[in-house]
From Swiss-Prot:
NCBIfam families: clpX, PRK05342.1. Pfam families: AAA_2, ClpB_D2-small, zf-C4_ClpX. Keywords: ATP-binding, Chaperone, Metal-binding, Nucleotide-binding, Zinc. This is ATP-dependent Clp protease ATP-binding subunit ClpX. Component of the ClpX-ClpP complex. Forms a hexameric ring that, in the presence of ATP, binds to fourteen ClpP subunits assembled into a disk-like structure with a central cavity, resembling the structure of eukaryotic proteasomes. GO terms for biological process: cell division; proteolysis involved in protein catabolic process. ATP binds at P118, T119, G120, S121, G122, K123, T124, F125. CDD domains: RecA-like_ClpX. It comes from Streptococcus agalactiae serotype Ia (strain ATCC 27591 / A909 / CDC SS700).
Length: 408
């Protein structure tokens, strides 16, 4: 029997039977021994099983039409962007599944995504919804907090740590996750001419991001922060991580107009008529993005461009009421726990939408406006047992009157 044999002084592995002289190290446990070779083999078996589980999950990726249906349940408008995202995400995970399970000689490159759209148009929410529907780890990073190596700030590898943490430190699962990098337009080069001074927040960060976006084996500090000598690192391969980057790119429509041979408003007549800036956003090509300040190599790793439109008041009202997790439904549910019915007048919903447009916050500002309107109600209602219904009026939203209360 393998193990510690009493007839000699040698120690044997309880699993493979090799003696301590035949292996590098034997670890003693409670009545059992295991050699370094069996430890390595066990780790390899576990790693393979985890990878198989991940691939099995990816094999069930919804088709583009199914992804679009899921997005439609949560995201109002942005139909062109949703279709582009659905196709890109499906193709990405199809590529991951087939390249890991076949010996095809064709090298399928991944299609990372660039989303361009104004603040509050739904860029972050689209990325979050996709990751949730696919049941893959998801992490968000702000490009403005990143700096290139050697400068005070956050290393790009810390983005990968967020993804690893979202995967509960299951690296194999993290390697098939989605990372959304917001405010990518804020690290554009300031002008097309390269400065002789160091560009801490611009081109240098783009170059650092480029390495992990195109696919590399990165060393990530387990606790975040800067790397230190002799520090244990987590190794993660980024070749199958889907990167979605987004930004407002304020003013890029002027670059599109110039390329199309039109003069910017205020400097002359246009030679070609396009209805509005939203239409110009659909005309964006890589040349415009490069002129804005992203380097060609970085743009080349973002072949899918999805342009999001500025949300109208009607869009914002639909966002308030239609999605499965619509804000109006959430607040109605909250008050129902106190036995109170909540109703919003149609002109109250429009007033909320108008406030969000006035503040230039888009959809992300809707919750704070409702919170302002509902604060006193949510404070008083739990103590007023005779109230059965609350009606939010336009005047209540504008702050000129209180919500209407109905009692039993």
């Amino acid at each position: 029997m393998a193990g510690n044999r009493n007839n000699d002084m040698n120690v044997y592995c309880s699993f493979c039977g090799k003696s301590q002289d035949e292996v590098k190290k034997i670890i003693a446990g409670n009545g059992v021994f295991i050699c370094n070779e069996c430890v390595a083999l066990s780790q390899e078996i576990i790693k393979e099983e985890l990878a198989e589980e991940v691939l099995a999950d990816l094999a069930e990726v919804p088709k583009p039409k199914e992804l679009l249906e899921i997005l439609n349940q949560y995201v109002v408008g942005q139909d062109r962007a949703k279709r582009a995202l659905a196709v890109a995400v499906y193709n990405h995970y199809k590529r991951v599944s087939y390249t890991e399970s076949s010996d095809d000689d064709v090298d399928l490159q991944k299609s990372n995504i660039l989303m361009i759209g104004p603040t509050g148009s739904g860029k972050t929410f689209l990325a979050q919804t996709l990751a949730k529907s696919l049941n893959v780890p998801f992490a968000i990073a702000d490009a403005t907090s990143l700096t290139e190596a050697g400068y005070v700030g956050e290393d790009v590898e810390n983005i990968l740590l967020k993804l690893i943490q979202a995967a509960d430190y299951n690296v194999e699962r993290a390697e098939r996750g989605i990372i959304y990098v917001d405010e990518i337009d804020k690290i554009a080069k300031k002008g097309e001419n390269v400065s002789i001074t160091r560009d801490v927040s611009g081109e240098g960060v783009q170059q650092a991001l480029l390495k992990i976006i195109e696919g590399t084996v990165a060393s990530v500090p387990p606790q975040g922060g800067r790397k230190h000598p002799n520090q244990e690192m987590i190794q993660i391969n980024t070749k199958n991580i889907l990167f979605i980057v987004g930004g407002a790119f304020d003013g890029i429509e002027d670059l599109v107009k110039q390329r199309l041979g039109e003069k910017i408003i205020g400097f002359g007549q246009t030679s070609r008529k396009i209805d509005d800036n939203a239409s110009y956003m659909q005309e964006i090509i890589s040349e415009d993005i490069q002129k804005f300040g992203l380097i060609p190599e970085f743009i080349g790793r973002l072949p899918v461009v999805a342009a999001l439109e500025l949300l109208t008041a009607e869009d914002l009202v639909r966002i308030l009421t239609e999605p499965r997790n619509a804000l109006v439904k959430q607040y109605q549910t909250l008050l129902s726990y106190d036995g109170v019915e909540l109703e919003f007048d149609q002109d109250a919903l429009l007033a909320i939408a108008d406030k969000a447009i006035e503040r230039k916050t888009g959809a992300r500002g809707l919750r704070s406006i409702i919170e302002e309107t509902m604060l006193d109600i949510m404070f008083e209602i739990p103590s007023q047992e005779d109230v059965t219904k609350v009606r939010i009026t336009k005047a209540a939203v504008e702050g000129t009157d209180k919500p209407v209360l109905e009692t039993a």
